[in-house]
Amino acid sequence: MTATPQSARFSVSLIFLIYGTLIGSYLPYLPFVKDRFGIGESAFSMGFLFGAGGALLSLPLAPWIIKQVGTRKAVLVMSLCYLSMVGFMMAAPSFPIFLAVFLLVGLTISTWEIAVNSQASAIEDQMGRPVISSIHGFWSLGTFIGSAAMAGWLALELNGIWLIWGLIVLSFLALPKVYDGLMRREQIPAESTKESAPLKLKYMLYPPLIAVAFYMIAGYMLEGTFQAGGA
C-alpha cells in the first residue's frame, strides 16, 4: 500500500510524539538513577558524554545506512533499538553498564534524526506547504506529556521506572502504525534515484550553512547542559 502525504505526516508526528514523551519521562527520573549508583553530579553529568559520543560516532555512517535501507526502514530499526536501549539503560545495575548502554542509545540517534527529518522534508515538498514545524511540535508536546506524567507518578510515590517501561511498551505497540504510514522509497525522489550527487566542498563552505551549523552546535550545547544539570 502506498502512503499518502497525510498518512506520512501522521506517522512522523506520532514518532516525534513517542520520542518526546519518553525523553520527557526519563529525564526527571535520572536523579533517582544517579542516587542508585551512589555517585555525584559531576561524575553522572560526564556520563552524558557517552550518549553524545555515540551520536557523533554514528553520524558518518548514517547516510550510508539510510542509502542501503531507506528512511522508512531506518526509522523503524532505529526506533526499535532506541526503545530497547532506553529500557535497559534505566534499569542498569551499575554505572559502567549505564554508560555502555547510553553509548548505544547515542548510536541510534543520528540515523534516526536524519531519516525521520528526511521523511518530514519529503512530506512538506509533496503537500506544498510548510508542515515541518508543526511535526516538530509533537516532540515538544511529548516532552510536556512525559514530564507531567512522571511528576504525577512520583507524586503518588510510585517507582518511576515502571512508568518508563509502560511507555516503552505502548511505543512498541504504536510502531507498526508508524511504519505503515511512512512514505516508501519510490515516493521520495532522493531515495528512488540510484545516482548519488557528488559532494562539493563549496557547498559545505556556503556561509549560511556554516551559520546554521554553529547555531545548531550552540543549541545542542545548551540542551546538553540543561539535561546534565537537571539530572
What are these regions (language model features)?
Residues 58-71, 154:
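Helix-to-loop junctions at the C-terminal end of transmembrane segments
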Residues 26-27, 202-231:
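Extracytoplasmic gate region of multi-pass secondary transporters
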Residues 103-137:
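Cytoplasmic helix-loop-helix junction between adjacent transmembrane helices
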Residues 38, 70, 91-96:
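Helix-breaking motifs and short loop linkers at transmembrane-helix boundaries and internal kinks
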Residues 97, 134-186:
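Helix-loop-helix hairpin linking two adjacent transmembrane segments in secondary transporters
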Residues 85, 96-105:
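Paired small-residue
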Residues 46-64:
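Central cavity-lining transmembrane alpha-helices of secondary-active solute carriers
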Residues 80-93:
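C-terminal ends and interior cores of transmembrane alpha-helices
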